[in-house]
């Protein structure tokens, strides 16, 4: 299981962006991230075509299956979920379709119940909710 955002475990810096200007102002080793909204598909395409490492954050409690697969066509490093049920569903899709993107659940890393749910559900990894400013 991947563990991102823990103070004792080194990981890349996640930078929330809203447009290509945000990409240009980020460092080369940053992972840019943005909301999984259809209006951001062009941003995902830009990242894919230009070799920019990016992640997509699914903020909704109801994942739109088409949105999930459309974003995955552009090969994000991570798909990050704040809703555990959506993370579990996405992990099933990622496993069944052999997607390259890793599924992460955004959580309080001190929440032992969430750790158990993620482990039992075989979620690819977790990310500290403090690493990202999720709405």
Model regions and ranges:
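Short, surface-exposed beta-strand/loop "edge" segments at domain boundaries and coil↔beta transitions
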Residues: 24, 41-42, 113, 133-135
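Glycine-enriched alpha-helix->loop->beta-strand junction motifs that scaffold or abut catalytic
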Residues: 49-54, 68-77, 93-105, 120-126
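Structural signal for conserved beta-strand scaffold positions within catalytic alpha/beta enzyme cores
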Residues: 5, 16, 105-106, 127
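N-terminal donor/sugar-recognition subdomains of glycan-related enzymes
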Residues: 19, 130-131
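Glycine-rich beta-to-alpha transition loops that act as phosphate-gripper elements at the mouths
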Residues: 35-38, 58-62, 78-84, 103-112, ...
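Conserved N-terminal beta1-alpha1 strand-loop-helix module at the mouth
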Residues: 1-77
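Catalytic cores of alpha/beta
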Residues: 66-68, 84-94, 110-124, 128, ...
